[in-house]
């Protein structure tokens, strides 16, 4: 809400990852945004990608200052919106300094590589037919519910086959605020970053307040780091791979 303009924010919610086909104006999924002060919210939803590729359907995004994508199954978002006018409008929103955010499936879809895209189960990391996300975060794969569901090692399967990708794992109650290449961790738990480009491969965990450079794949020193130990500054190394 703050990034989208506070009480002046114009929010478009895209709930298509969920299983239901209809989302009324009083849909309960809007409650967190309303509680955060949102006064101008529109729901944008379709299962028809031809409709999603029309200017008329995507028009609310042209006026939006923020987009929020709730959870569900990410393959539904691919089927409805990948390479459509809606997808293009998300990039245009960022170009005019708007914000696009999401939770669970709505977080994973923002990456260039799509994890857990299999329509049958969310336990499969790599689905042959669903490997492409929206790409707002280039050269990345984003997993979620990481520590809460014991998924700390799951991203290695993706990175073993695609070592150029940066793996990002988000625990519940935790998010990244990304500006250009800098990703700031906020929330109550951890964000993990996985790098398989050079041995030894590693995953590093960072708590709220840490900033990670997605381009150089290194932590960014902050004022709070001056009194921290070297281990705290560099993050906690997890799951090093040979």
Annotated model-derived regions:
Residues 12, 18-63, 69, 76:
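Portal/gating segments that form or line small-molecule/metal binding sites
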Residues 70, 76-149:
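Class I SAM-dependent methyltransferase SAM-binding "motif I" and its flanking Rossmann-like core
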Residues 37-40, 96, 163:
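A short helix-to-beta-strand connector/capping loop
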Residues 1-7, 17-27, 32-35, 115-242:
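C-terminal and late-domain segments of enzyme folds
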Residues 54-66, 75-96, 208-227, 231-238, ...:
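Mature, structured domains of secreted/extracytosolic soluble proteins
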């Amino acid at each position: 809400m703050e990034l989208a303009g506070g009480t002046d924010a114009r929010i478009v919610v895209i709930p298509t990852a969920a299983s239901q086909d209809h989302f009324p104006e009083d849909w309960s999924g809007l409650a967190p945004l309303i509680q955060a002060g949102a006064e101008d919210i529109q729901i944008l939803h379709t299962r028809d990608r031809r409709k999603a590729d029309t200017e008329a359907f995507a028009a609310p995004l042209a006026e939006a200052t923020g987009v929020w994508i709730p959870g569900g199954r990410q393959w539904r978002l691919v089927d409805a919106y990948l390479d459509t006018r809606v997808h293009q409008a998300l990039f245009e929103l960022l170009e005019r300094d708007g914000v696009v955010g999401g939770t669970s499936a709505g977080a994973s879809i923002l990456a260039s590589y799509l994890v857990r895209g299999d329509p049958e189960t969310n336990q499969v990391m790599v689905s042959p037919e669903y490997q492409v996300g929206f790409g707002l975060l280039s050269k990345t794969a984003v997993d979620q519910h990481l520590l809460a569901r014991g998924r700390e090692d799951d991203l290695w399967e993706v990175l073993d086959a695609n070592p150029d990708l940066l793996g990002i794992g988000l625990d519940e109650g935790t998010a990244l605020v990304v500006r250009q290449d800098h990703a700031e961790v906020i929330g109550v738990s951890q964000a993990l970053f996985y790098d398989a480009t050079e041995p030894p491969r590693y995953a590093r965990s960072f708590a709220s307040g840490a900033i990670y450079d997605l381009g150089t794949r290194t932590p960014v020193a902050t004022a709070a780091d001056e009194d921290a130990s070297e281990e705290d500054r560099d993050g906690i190394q997890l799951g090093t791979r040979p």
